[in-house]
Regions:
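Short hydrophobic membrane-inserting alpha-helices and related fusion/pore-forming segments
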Residues: 1, 54, 653-677
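N-terminal secretion-targeting helices of virulence/extracellular proteins
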Residues: 1-170, 755-766
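Compositionally biased amphipathic helical and low-complexity segments enriched in hydrophobic
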Residues: 7, 15-20, 589, 662-667, ...
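Amphipathic interfacial alpha-helices that partition to lipid-water interfaces
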Residues: 651, 682-698, 703
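Mature, well-folded catalytic/scaffold domains that follow N-terminal targeting or propeptide regions
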Residues: 168, 172-181, 680, 688
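Membrane-insertive, amphipathic helical modules of secreted toxins and fusogens
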Residues: 668, 741, 748-765
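Flexible coil/linker segments and helix-coil junctions enriched in charged and small residues
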Residues: 116-144, 351-357, 658-671, 738
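Non-catalytic all-alpha helical scaffold/repeat segments
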Residues: 173-658, 701-753
Length: 766
């Protein structure tokens, strides 16, 4: 039994008012932090969307972001300290009340006296035998009850102290985002952490049922930073890779069995817990992260065993990991792989019996987790901050002094064509493969996880966030693009459009991701396509506004090339076509044709939309004609299929956020978010887009296979833009604008714009 730090006399006369006052002070602090939350969030948003230049670009934003995160941690820690103090006060008050009742009431009633120091006695003089024995029994009982009260107090006192230590965290300079509601909860978390460590020390000796229990314990506390750090530090980096390698490779799990499910749950829960632990900035966890990275190239269990990278990357498939750790770990992993004199599959997939992964459809399809880069890419896809830093442009990829300034524009003609080494290696040079059963590695052009990581890096959004179920919540977060994500997008456009224009055709799995990226940068794409003249584009700066002046800087020609590359891919072609349609509707809704000036602005956006559509349509037609040169039937089937992007089913517009994004669904589960022009009306856009879908559905029956000639395909593309123009012209007429006498502008600009777009592709887009 724990020894109490409080004596009988101290407990009896303990002044608890100060403890109660401390709890109320923490409660007041919580309420103050709640009142300041909106200001803190606004500060973070302003910092994120501001255009930073000079040294501030790399210093201010990370600093402010960190302070906002610390603000949230401070609020959670303050609430936890309040809760623990309240609970602790209640426990001490209960012990004191029990003791007072015993001393002041129960003992005197039994003829027993308790001294100021807690000594129990009774006056036995002159008592008969039975009364004397009763008094002696009462002395023993009262003394025992005092001992029991002090014993419980000792336990409570130790638990309160331990809970407060857990709440304080391990870093004296940072707040700890713990979230305990009681002393008991903190004690259970600490006990569970110790129980988990005891179980994991047994490694592969654990039964299947024990693996299930271990996964439950970890999952229960996956978001508890104190629990997570206790487990991570207790295991140590070597213990982590030894444990998972032993579990994953030490027994034969069969898919569909409870044992397999337990292994998958354990992998996910352990990854979640380790991710939470890395979010701590304590010295101990920073050393842990460094040591884990350093042992990645070591063999687990000696020569012939799997590398540490394989075990840790399997655990990266779930969890919210610290961006610094992911960047350092990723650099070490790829450096080790690239230094290897041979194919990556020979380095990682040397043992066909090895399994490291049990998660997701990939495991069911045969992804045994023998490619550690996949786990890294999945983690980067969930962590945009890390992905953006991982794919940041090198020093040689410097902006030129061209227009606009600021921000500066990347000049693809300058002597700085080298993009991020990791980006180019993973996109076009690396050998990707799947581990399928006990067979040899199955080569693939590129893995989906790389597309997810690149999407996160270039847009600031975690992969997979734009779905029908999450759209409203995600769009409420606003436009996540920053100067840093835009510089990644510069490289993506340059790599896929200019440096390696056939790369997307060679890696079609990238089509949906690149189409989604283009959708989020549709404002910049329209700006650069609008004119090849710098002076003319200046007039379109407001029409195709970019958040806080930050703009992708690939210029007119490079943007045409990028669109051409996307147009050659069926999925990307459809996504760009749909994104352009919605984006232009947004621009039109923000430019109601109330006068000649407004009408001309709207017609300029329609003309640009026609050019964009002409570029991607021309690219798609030429690709289909080349690929199916000797099969006319397949050519017309492919053309009809590529023209049916509008078949997103019912309403194409799923939702819109107040921060200026709209989202459209796309067949196959992909989705695109599109920036809205300032002043755009999301409800109106949705209404018009749905009307467009209904109109096209009526004119083009949804048959199992639509066939279309090249001429019909181009006519359909031009008609889509003509629908935009007709909507706008009708709106102008309804406002009373005399198009013949006041504007003197011939309608049907979409025809000239569409033809010009096709010409642009033929001139520079191939």
């Amino acid at each position: 039994m724990a020894r109490s730090t409080l004596t009988f006399e101290e407990l009896l006369h303990l002044q608890l008012a100060k403890l109660d006052e401390a709890a109320e002070e923490w409660d007041l602090q919580v309420r103050r932090l709640d009142d300041m939350k909106d200001l803190a969030d606004a500060m973070g948003e302003h910092a994120r969307t501001a255009t930073w230049t000079g040294e501030n670009a790399g210093l201010t934003l990370p600093y402010v972001t960190e302070q906002v995160e610390q603000f949230d941690a401070a609020r959670r820690q303050a609430a936890t300290l309040r809760n623990l103090l309240r609970d602790g006060h209640g426990r001490l008050k209960y012990a004191q009340d029990r003791l007072k009742t015993l001393v002041e009431s129960d003992a005197p009633r039994a003829g027993v006296h308790v001294s100021a120091s807690g000594e129990v006695s009774s006056d036995l003089d002159g008592l008969d035998g039975d009364t004397r024995r009763a008094r002696q029994d009462a002395v023993v009982e009262i003394a025992g009850r005092i001992t029991e009260i002090l014993g419980v107090l000792a336990q409570d006192d130790a638990e309160i102290a331990a809970a407060l230590r857990s709440a304080m965290g391990t870093d004296p300079d940072r707040f700890s985002p713990v979230d305990y509601t009681s002393v008991q909860q903190a004690r259970l978390a600490r006990e569970d952490a110790d129980r988990v460590l005891d179980m994991m020390a047994r490694g592969n000796d654990l039964s299947d049922d024990e693996l299930h229990d271990l996964a439950l314990f970890l999952d229960l506390h996956r978001d508890d930073p104190a629990f997570a750090e206790r487990v991570a530090l207790g295991l140590g980096p070597q213990g982590v890779v030894d444990f998972w390698s032993g579990i994953a490779g030490g027994r034969d799990f069969r898919e569909g069995t409870p044992a397999w499910d337990s292994a998958a749950a354990l992998q996910a829960a352990l990854g979640d817990v380790l991710g939470t632990a890395t979010r701590s900035d304590s010295d101990a966890m920073e050393r842990w992260e460094q040591d884990m990275t350093a042992l990645g190239d070591d063999r687990v269990g000696g020569p012939g065993g799997p590398h540490g990278f394989l075990a840790m990357s399997a655990l990266l498939r779930t969890g919210d990991y610290d961006p610094d750790f992911l960047v350092d770990y990723g650099d070490a992993l790829l450096s080790f792989e690239q230094d290897y004199d041979g194919r990556p599959s020979m380095l990682w997939d040397s043992d066909p019996r090895l399994r490291m992964n049990f998660l997701g459809e990939g495991a069911q399809e045969g992804d045994r987790g023998r490619d550690p880069v996949i786990g890294l890419m999945e983690a980067l896809g969930r962590t945009p901050e890390a992905a953006t830093r991982f794919f940041a442009p090198p020093d040689g990829f410097s902006p030129s002094d061209g227009y606009p300034a600021p921000p500066q524009v990347f000049d693809p003609g300058a002597d700085n064509e080298q993009v991020n080494e990791r980006l180019r290696y993973l996109a076009s040079e690396r050998e990707w493969w799947l581990s399928t059963g006990h067979m040899a590695p199955d080569p693939i052009p590129v893995h989906d996880s790389f597309a997810d990581a690149l999407f996160a890096a270039a847009t600031g959004n975690p992969s997979g966030v734009f779905t029908a179920d999450t759209v409203e919540e995600r769009l409420a977060d606003g436009d996540m693009r920053t100067a840093d994500t835009t510089r990644v997008m510069d490289q993506v456009m340059h790599l896929y459009g200019t440096l390696e224009p056939n790369l997307l055709e060679e890696t079609p799995a990238m089509g949906a991701a690149l189409g989604a990226m283009a959708g989020l940068y549709m404002d910049d794409i329209n700006f650069w396509i609008s004119d090849d003249s710098e002076a003319a584009r200046r007039l379109n700066e407001d029409l195709f506004g970019s958040p806080d002046g930050e703009r992708a800087g690939n210029g007119h020609t490079n943007t045409i090339r990028f669109l051409g590359a996307l147009g050659r891919d069926e999925t990307a072609h459809g996504m760009v076509s749909q994104a352009e349609q919605i984006y232009t509707l947004g621009v039109l809704s923000a430019s109601p044709p109330t006068d000649e000036s407004q009408f001309l602005r709207g017609m300029e956006s329609i003309s640009t939309a026609a050019e964009v559509r002409g570029i991607v349509d021309q690219a798609r037609v030429e690709t289909i004609n080349t690929r199916y040169m000797d099969d006319e039937g397949e050519r017309i089937r492919q053309l009809g299929q590529s023209s049916g992007w509008w078949k997103a089913g019912g309403a194409a517009l799923l939702g819109a956020g107040a921060a200026g994004l709209s989202l459209a669904a796309f067949p196959g589960g992909a989705a695109i978010a599109v920036p809205l022009a300032a002043g755009a009306s999301p409800p109106l856009i949705g209404e018009l887009m749905n009307q467009f879908v209904d109109d096209v559905s009526v004119s083009s029956p949804d048959t199992a296979q639509v066939e279309m000639t090249e001429s019909q395909f181009f006519t359909a593309g031009k008609r889509d833009v003509a629908d935009l123009e007709q909507i706008y012209v009708d709106a102008a007429i309804n406002t009373g604008l005399d198009l013949d006498t006041e504007v003197r502008l011939p309608v049907q600009v979409e025809g000239a714009g569409y033809r010009h777009g096709r010409d642009l592709y033929e001139e520079v887009g191939r």
